[in-house]
Amino acid sequence: MKDRLAHVVREAARALTRDLTARLATQGVSFGHWAFLRILWESDNLTQRELSEQAGVMEPTTAAALRAMEELGYIERRQLPENRKNVYVHLTPRGRALRAKLEPMAVAVNKAAVRGADPAEVAACRRVLLGILENLKA
C-alpha cells in the first residue's frame, strides 16, 4: 500500500508543504497566504471569486484569508463605484515586496526535494505528474 503512486505523491506533497511552511514562517507568512500571494504576484486586481477559482478553494476560505492578509498589510480590497457587487483584490507595496523574500524559499525547497536526482528523471517525473493532473481533471 505504501508504494502506491497516490500514497507516494501525497507523502511527497506533504513533505514539500511542511518544508515550505517552515521557511515561510521565518518571514511571518502562512502557507495559506502563500497560495494567494503567488497568484496575485502573477495577476493582481482579481475579484475574490477569480482568486478562489485560481486557488481551488471555496469563497468563504478566500474571504477569511484575505481578511487576515489585509490586516497584515499585504493586500487591499476595493469595490468599483459602478459595480459594488465585485470585490477586487490588490497587492500593497508590502505584499509585492514579499515576493523577493518568499520565491527564493520555494525555489530552495524544490531544489532540496530533487537533490541527487538526475535532471532527466526529474523532467520525466514532472511530465508524468502533469499527465496525471490532465487525466484526472474533473
Tell me what each language-model feature is:
Residues 57-61:
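Helix-turn-helix DNA-binding motif, specifically the short coil turn and the N-cap/start of the second
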Residues 43-47:
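Short capping segments at the starts of secondary-structure elements
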Residues 37-40, 99:
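Hydrophobic residues on short alpha-helical segments
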Residues 39, 54, 72:
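Residues within the alpha-helical elements of helix-turn-helix
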Residues 123-138:
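Exposed, interaction-prone assembly regions rather than primary DNA-binding/catalytic cores
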Residues 3-7, 27-38, 63:
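Short alpha-helical elements of helix-turn-helix
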